[in-house]
C-alpha cells in the first residue's frame, strides 16, 4: 500500500502520464478495480480520454467517478439506502425552523423574510458541513467570542438554526455534504474497494470531509496516485505562505503526507514531469514562456514578438467583453476552420457573465455550456 504524488507544471502531461499508467496496470491485473476520481464536471471528458487511449477502446476494470458517484456506487453494493435532501428541501426546512425558533433569534429574526436570506443561511450551513464543523465545534468557538459583539450574535443565530436543522435530519435524511461521511463508515465493508487502486486527477485540494474518507480508504486501498500542479523547479515541501502561487498545491501535498504518516501508509518517491516537447503548450512558445514566468519571483522578459498568440483588449462592460469574444469566435470559425469544442471562455466571475451568455451567444448562433451548477429555484 503506497501513496505516490505526480508533480508537473500546467500542461506538462500529468493527466496523460497517469492515464497511460492506470491503463497499463488495469490491463496487467484484470481482477483489480481501478478508480479514477476527478471533479464532477470532468467525469465524462476523462472517460472519453481513457477509452480513446485504451486498447480496442474498451475499459473494463477502470471506473471514472467523482467523490459523490463513488459513494453511490458503494451504497449500491452494500444496499445502503439514504434519502438525500435536495437544496429545495433544505430551504423549506430552514424556513420552517426559522418560524419555530424566531423568538430565540436576535440578528436573523428581522432579516429572515428578506428575499434570498434563507438561501444565504443554507449556503453557510452547507459549508459548515462540508468542512466538517459540527454544531458542538461551532458552539465551542462561540464561547471564545465577546458576548456583546455582532459576530457573536450572528453566529449564535446560525448555531441555533444549525442545531435545529441537524436535529430534524437525525435518522431521516442525509445532506449531499454528509454523503462522504456515510461512505467513510462503509469503506471497511466494501469488497469493491478492497485492494483497489485510486487515481486522483484535477484537484487543487481536498476538503476535511474528503480527507476523512481518504484516511479510512488508506486501510483498504492498495495504492493511491495524486496529480499535483507545481512548477518542477519548486520544492513541494517548502512553506512560502498563503501568498505563494503554489500555496494550494503545497498545502495539499502536506495534508496527504501527514495523512499517510498517521495511517502508516507508505509514501513512494514522487514523480516530477519536466516541461518538454510533448507538453500542451509546446507549440506556442509565447504561452509556454508565460506559464514559466507569470507571477514568478524570478521572471524573464519575452524578447520576441508575441504575434497572434497573445492579445489584450479592454472593454467597458462584461456584456461588451462577451460580445467581442463571440464575434472573435465566429470570425475564427469562418477564417480558420476551427471547431467550437476547441474553445473555452475563462472568466473570474462566472455568475456575472452567465446572465449575458444566452442573449449574446444566441445572437451569433454559437452553442455554449456554462460550467455552473443549476439548483432548482426555491419557492420560499
Task: Give the residues covered by each predicted segment.
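Conserved RecA-like helicase motor-core motifs
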Residues: 58-63, 365-374
Amino acid at each position: 500500500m503506497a501513496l505516490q504524488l505526480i508533480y508537473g507544471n500546467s500542461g506538462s502531461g500529468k493527466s496523460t502520464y497517469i492515464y497511460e499508467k492506470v491503463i497499463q496496470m488495469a490491463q496487467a491485473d484484470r481482477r483489480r478495480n481501478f478508480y479514477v476520481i476527478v471533479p464532477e464536471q470532468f467525469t465524462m471528458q476523462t472517460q472519453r480520454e481513457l477509452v480513446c487511449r485504451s486498447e480496442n477502446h474498451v475499459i473494463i476494470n477502470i471506473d471514472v467517478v467523482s467523490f459523490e458517484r463513488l459513494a453511490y456506487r458503494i451504497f449500491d453494493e452494500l444496499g445502503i439506502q439514504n434519502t438525500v435532501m435536495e437544496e429545495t428541501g433544505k430551504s423549506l426546512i430552514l424556513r420552517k425552523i426559522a418560524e419555530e425558533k424566531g423568538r430565540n433569534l436576535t440578528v436573523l429574526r428581522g432579516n429572515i423574510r428578506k428575499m434570498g436570506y434563507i438561501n444565504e443561511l443554507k449556503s453557510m450551513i452547507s459549508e459548515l458541513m462540508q468542512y466538517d464543523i459540527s454544531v458542538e465545534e461551532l458552539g465551542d468557538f462561540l464561547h471564545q467570542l465577546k458576548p456583546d459583539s455582532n459576530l457573536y450574535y450572528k453566529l449564535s443565530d446560525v448555531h441555533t438554526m444549525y442545531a435545529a436543522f441537524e436535529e430534524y435530519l437525525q435518522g431521516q435524511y442525509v445532506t449531499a455534504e454528509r454523503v462522504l461521511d456515510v461512505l467513510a463508515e462503509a469503506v471497511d465493508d466494501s469488497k469493491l474497494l478492497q485492494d483497489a487502486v485510486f487515481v486522483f486527477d484535477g484537484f487543487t485540494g481536498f476538503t476535511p470531509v474528503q480527507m476523512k474518507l481518504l484516511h479510512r480508504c488508506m486501510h483498504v486501498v492498495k495504492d493511491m496516485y495524486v496529480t499535483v500542479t507545481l512548477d518542477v523547479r519548486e520544492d513541494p515541501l517548502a512553506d512560502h505562505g498563503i501568498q505563494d502561487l503554489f500555496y494550494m498545491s503545497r498545502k495539499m501535498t502536506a495534508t496527504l503526507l501527514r495523512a499517510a504518516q498517521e495511517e502508516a501508509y507508505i509514501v513512494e518517491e514522487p514523480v516530477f514531469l519536466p516541461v518538454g516537447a510533448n507538453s500542451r503548450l509546446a507549440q506556442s512558445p509565447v504561452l509556454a514562456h508565460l506559464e514559466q514566468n507569470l507571477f514568478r519571483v524570478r521572471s524573464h522578459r519575452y524578447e520576441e514578438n508575441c504575434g497572434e498568440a497573445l492579445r489584450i483588449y479592454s472593454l467597458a462592460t462584461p456584456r461588451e467583453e462577451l460580445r467581442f469574444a463571440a464575434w472573435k469566435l465566429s470570425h475564427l470559425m469562418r477564417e480558420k476552420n476551427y471547431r467550437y469544442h476547441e474553445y473555452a471562455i475563462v472568466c473570474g466571475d462566472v455568475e456575472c457573465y452567465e446572465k449575458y451568455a444566452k442573449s449574446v451567444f444566441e445572437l451569433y448562433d454559437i452553442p455554449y455550456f456554462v460550467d455552473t451548477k443549476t439548483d432548482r429555484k426555491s419557492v420560499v
